[in-house]
Amino acid sequence: MNYTVKFQNVTKKYKMYNKPSDKLKDLFRKQEDGVFHYALSNVSFEVPKGEIVGIIGLNGSGKSTLSNLIAGVTMPNKGKIDIKGSAALIAISSGLNGQLSGIENIELKGLMMGLTKEKVKEIIPQIIEFADIGKFINQPVKTYSSGMKARLGFAISVNINPDVLVIDEALSVGDQTFTNKCLKKMNEFKEKGKTIFFISHSLNQVNSFCTKAIWLYYGQVREYGDVNDVVANYRAFLKEYNQMSMEDRKKFQEEQVLQFQHGLLQDYAKETLTNPRRLKGERRKYKKKNRVILGISLALMAGIISVGVYYKDIFPIKQDTQHVKQAVQGEDTNEAKQDKRQRVEENMYMVKSNGINIRKEASASSEKLAVANFGDIITIFDDNKSKEKDAEWIQVSLSKGEIGWVSTKFIEPFKSNDSIIEDAKLADITALLKRVYGENMASAPTYFGKTLNELKATYPQPLNPLPSMAGKTIVKDGNIQFGILQDKVVEVVFQDISMSIAKLHELLGKESLSNDVEKNYFYETKSYYIAARSDQTHREIQSISIVKK
């Protein structure tokens, strides 16, 4: 068959580590052993030249992994991929260096794709005209919005003229005018017989533009064929899926993960599992390697301690006796404060996931009172519990004296720990957002404690009211949302910010708590709770909630 792209039994998995030191230990272990995330499993298909293939599926089904494999960004662990010609990936900020300007990124990406310097200079005016981002073309890409990154990435990729074009959600962040321009350019590629992979959650765009479709389902190809048939079947599945409650969805997802061997799995070599003697030998080797690692670690620690003692003798540390005396005098007061805080924290729980319903009764079919997201802190009501089938529910206090019920599967006891960061870290976040989204981002936290009338009177832009959430009054201006409780601003949420997870960790450091599956991160400062929530479609932090303690 005259194909352009061919996948044969392709599997892609990622090794999971709990902490950075595990990567060092992995040097002494068998690479086949450990916990892996299976993004794709045994995927096979062929795409003829000139086809436009839509890739659809739920979040986390492997769409972006598939696009990276086609574009050669990553390599498969098993199976074979055959691409005839060059492939270019268009995704939000894909292949763009945030420290370089737009012009410099054009030159760099062109050279990386094998173009000569003369050819790059020739296409630069076309790329600038298509991207249409004005004076920002000479600014660092890190100052761009998501839409501007998508514009530049799309303009570069289509003007490099690849044989295979992979578009991963790049049209989801632009305005309608730019989207129409992109679709027109894609139709030109279509007429030239180019092969295009179009990844999108917009089924209408997929249906109208594509000739075929691949439905990815928990890392496997559930259906591949005519776009009308595949999209129709996927729509029917979505209709049934969207009618499920959040609790039913969680249960359904767990069942499908087990059935399709998708997600986090423990890997062992088959020969080892089927041979008890071999398994015993592997365990002995593993213990021996652990002893070697332990010996090296102890030697390093001894060396560090020796150096520390040596320099301590050379540079004696002065003791602040006055500070010690004050600490002793205030010990009783601090203990009383800690006891009081502990009693409060015993009733505090944190929500572990996004979109969790708080219901009127202890039942998944009961009326929904509110929706809680990862990082929300809730207070239980007298530790009242109830069981419904296999689910346990606990009674929680809402605002304005309301009482609701939430499944204990989605909450966990919350206690402050030693990972509290400085309040000043919040300024680093707002300073970064200010460069991209304007002055209002930096000033937003200054409105904590203001009444709704004071907020409206002092905020520089009109505030639009939204439906209340968990008893809180919600008002919004663009990317900034305020939550008002008991007529005081208690929460500020920055939305649609598209911040990389690496950048979040660079600014705030190690999180106190996290949901590694959903890529959500929780931080605590002296005065605030900070919840950074991701959108798995874009694999970036999309919102940051700041709550005053």
UniProtKB/Swiss-Prot annotation:
<dbReference type="InterPro" id="IPR027417">
    <property type="entry name" value="P-loop_NTPase"/>
</dbReference>
<dbReference type="GO" id="GO:0016887">
    <property type="term" value="F:ATP hydrolysis activity"/>
</dbReference>
<protein>
    <recommendedName>
        <fullName>Teichoic acids export ATP-binding protein TagH</fullName>
        <ecNumber>7.5.2.4</ecNumber>
    </recommendedName>
</protein>
<dbReference type="Pfam" id="PF00005">
    <property type="entry name" value="ABC_tran"/>
</dbReference>
<feature type="binding site">
    <location>
        <begin position="57"/>
        <end position="64"/>
    </location>
    <ligand>
        <name>ATP</name>
    </ligand>
</feature>
<comment type="similarity">
    <text>Belongs to the ABC transporter superfamily. Teichoic acids exporter (TC 3.A.1.104.1) family.</text>
</comment>
<dbReference type="InterPro" id="IPR003593">
    <property type="entry name" value="AAA+_ATPase"/>
</dbReference>
<dbReference type="GO" id="GO:0005886">
    <property type="term" value="C:plasma membrane"/>
</dbReference>
<dbReference type="InterPro" id="IPR017871">
    <property type="entry name" value="ABC_transporter-like_CS"/>
</dbReference>
<keyword id="KW-1278">Translocase</keyword>
<feature type="region of interest" description="Unknown">
    <location>
        <begin position="244"/>
        <end position="549"/>
    </location>
</feature>
<comment type="subunit">
    <text>The complex is composed of two ATP-binding proteins (TagH) and two transmembrane proteins (TagG).</text>
</comment>
<dbReference type="InterPro" id="IPR003439">
    <property type="entry name" value="ABC_transporter-like_ATP-bd"/>
</dbReference>
<dbReference type="InterPro" id="IPR015860">
    <property type="entry name" value="ABC_transpr_TagH-like"/>
</dbReference>
<keyword id="KW-0472">Membrane</keyword>
<feature type="domain" description="SH3b">
    <location>
        <begin position="346"/>
        <end position="415"/>
    </location>
</feature>
<comment type="function">
    <text>Part of the ABC transporter complex TagGH involved in teichoic acids export. Responsible for energy coupling to the transport system.</text>
</comment>
<dbReference type="GO" id="GO:0015438">
    <property type="term" value="F:ABC-type teichoic acid transporter activity"/>
</dbReference>
<keyword id="KW-0813">Transport</keyword>
<dbReference type="Pfam" id="PF08239">
    <property type="entry name" value="SH3_3"/>
</dbReference>
<keyword id="KW-0067">ATP-binding</keyword>
<dbReference type="InterPro" id="IPR003646">
    <property type="entry name" value="SH3-like_bac-type"/>
</dbReference>
<keyword id="KW-1003">Cell membrane</keyword>
<feature type="domain" description="ABC transporter">
    <location>
        <begin position="22"/>
        <end position="243"/>
    </location>
</feature>
<dbReference type="GO" id="GO:0005524">
    <property type="term" value="F:ATP binding"/>
</dbReference>
<dbReference type="InterPro" id="IPR050683">
    <property type="entry name" value="Bact_Polysacc_Export_ATP-bd"/>
</dbReference>
<keyword id="KW-0547">Nucleotide-binding</keyword>
